[in-house]
Amino acid sequence: MTLLQPYLPRGGVSASPYSEAGALYALGLIHANKGGSGDSTVITFLTNALRNAGVNEVVQHGSCLGIGLAAMATGNPELFEDLKGILLLDSAIAAEGAALSLGLVLLGQADSPLAQNNIPELLTWAH
């Protein structure tokens, strides 16, 4: 995270939302598929960035993509609910990132109760 630190959100008002969103996405790429290894520092950081993004849909988009990559194939129900909450907002930009990330988090989890209970509902939202 040291390399990306100047570009990552620091809380408060975003000076450059596109740089911050790109840095959050890059953080997810760097830590892709490591979410199940026990170290959840990056996922926690990305989740906090998502929650602190407020109505900034660009930062929400980058946070969602970062979460999806870092938590790939974990089937984490808390992350699923956070991403689903963004998906149901009236923002096409943020919802696109959330939808892609939901697929990444549920990767390989098709038989899990989380997927079985939620996929039919998610398909009703598909356009």
Say what each PLM segment does.
Residues M1-H127:
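Mature, well-folded catalytic/scaffold domains that follow N-terminal targeting or propeptide regions
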